[in-house]
Swiss-Prot record:
<feature type="transmembrane region" description="Helical">
    <location>
        <begin position="142"/>
        <end position="162"/>
    </location>
</feature>
<dbReference type="GO" id="GO:0005886">
    <property type="term" value="C:plasma membrane"/>
</dbReference>
<feature type="transmembrane region" description="Helical">
    <location>
        <begin position="163"/>
        <end position="183"/>
    </location>
</feature>
<feature type="transmembrane region" description="Helical">
    <location>
        <begin position="120"/>
        <end position="140"/>
    </location>
</feature>
<comment type="subunit">
    <text>Probably interacts with PlsX.</text>
</comment>
<comment type="similarity">
    <text>Belongs to the PlsY family.</text>
</comment>
<keyword id="KW-0594">Phospholipid biosynthesis</keyword>
<dbReference type="GO" id="GO:0043772">
    <property type="term" value="F:acyl-phosphate glycerol-3-phosphate acyltransferase activity"/>
</dbReference>
<keyword id="KW-0444">Lipid biosynthesis</keyword>
<dbReference type="GO" id="GO:0008654">
    <property type="term" value="P:phospholipid biosynthetic process"/>
</dbReference>
<keyword id="KW-1208">Phospholipid metabolism</keyword>
<feature type="transmembrane region" description="Helical">
    <location>
        <begin position="78"/>
        <end position="98"/>
    </location>
</feature>
<dbReference type="Pfam" id="PF02660">
    <property type="entry name" value="G3P_acyltransf"/>
</dbReference>
<feature type="transmembrane region" description="Helical">
    <location>
        <begin position="56"/>
        <end position="76"/>
    </location>
</feature>
<keyword id="KW-1003">Cell membrane</keyword>
<comment type="pathway">
    <text>Lipid metabolism; phospholipid metabolism.</text>
</comment>
<keyword id="KW-1133">Transmembrane helix</keyword>
Amino acid sequence: MKIVILLLVAYLLGSIPSGVWIGKLFFKKDIRQFGSGNTGTTNTFRVLGKPAGITVLLMDILKGTLATSLPYLFGLQGVNPLFFGVAAVLGHTFPIFANFKGGKAVATSAGMLLAYSPTFFIYSALIFVICLYLTSMVSLTSMISAVLITLSTIILPFTVPAILPTFNWLLTVIAIALTTFIFVRHRENIQRIKNGTESRLSFGLRAKKIKKKAVNK
């Protein structure tokens, strides 16, 4: 019974629609009615600005971290904490507090990794930042990073155990499932990337090249 209750708590934590609540409370805006209509970090940055975007990012990461830590906090043994992280991710993407329409699972998944292995989280964050610098697109970065991180759960335990000491089949299975889910949630972004109409950040190598071309014209 304790496991069921904590899984429900993890789902409810994940269901907190950070972007929606921040928008309504401080900006009198429902971000679902602006930009891409998504409740996650990227659309919050786009619609509400950098301070709000950073706040939502940290809140969404914290949801995954806190949920994954629940077994430790309540002395629950014999259960893999990743199950609680997955419950939070499901809450984030299908939030009961926002009509089951939520984000794209990236930030809360990162929070789950932070609780599971801080060193692997830092490694994964570096992958994300490098990919973002090279592409200037959050959507493409999220998908590429998900694939690379999934592969890393298999390779690193046998090559660089300092980052991820042991192979955990459940972590790999969850990573594969989340990667698939992230691709599904980004299907509209994939089409825009193909069409060359996907939004880019004013950050990174690609953004610099575009600015340089614009100046030369």
